[in-house]
Amino acid sequence: MHLSTALFSAIALLAATQVIGASVEVPRDVAAIQIATSPYYACNCPNNCKHKKGSGCKYHSGPSDKSKVISGKCEWQGGQLNCIAT
């Protein structure tokens, strides 16, 4: 009896979790997560390893995700690839 009650409770909890998770929408600011935190990381690893000279890039101008986004192109500067604003 206790086993069937525990099993039923576990299934009900799993079903409720799926329903709650399905109703959550992704916020529109998810794209902001993909923007680099500095001109260096906008053109280099870990997330932008395939960038090369002339590739388009974006980075936040300040320490916050709410900072202005600067767009540019990857260029060699001081021996390293950096995102230069265009």
Curated annotation (Swiss-Prot):
This is Antifungal protein 2. Residues 1-21 form the signal peptide. The keyword Membrane does not apply. Cysteine-rich antifungal protein highly effective against yeasts such as clinically relevant Candida species, including the multidrug-resistant pathogen Candida auris. Does not cause metabolic inactivity and apoptosis induction, but the fungal cell-killing activity is connected to its pore-forming ability in the cell membrane. NFAP2 has a low potential to trigger resistance in C.albicans in vitro, and the developed tolerance to NFAP2 is not associated with severe phenotypic changes compared with development of resistance to generic fluconazole. NFAP2 provides a feasible base for the development of a fundamental new, safely applicable mono- or polytherapeutic topical agent for the treatment of superficial candidiasis. Moreover, thanks to the slow emergence of NFAP2-resistant Candida strains, NFAP2 can reliably be used long-term in the clinic. The combination of NFAP2 and rationally designed antifungal peptide derivatives (PDs) as biofungicide can also be used for the fungal infection control in plants and crops as well as in postharvest fruit protection. A motif (Gamma-core) lies at residues 72-83. The lipid-binding region (residues 44 to 54) shows potency to insert into the lipid bilayer, where the disulfide bond-stabilized short motif CPNNC could play a key role. In addition, several areas, including the beginning of the N-terminal (residues 1-8), play roles in facilitating initial membrane contacts. Disulfide bonds join C43-C57, C45-C74, C49-C83. The lineage of its organism: Eukaryota, Fungi, Dikarya, Ascomycota, Pezizomycotina. Keywords: Antimicrobial, Disulfide bond, Secreted, Signal. Transmembrane segments: none annotated. It is found in: Secreted. The keyword Signal applies. The gene is nfap2. Residues 44-54 are annotated as: Lipid-binding. Its main location: secreted.
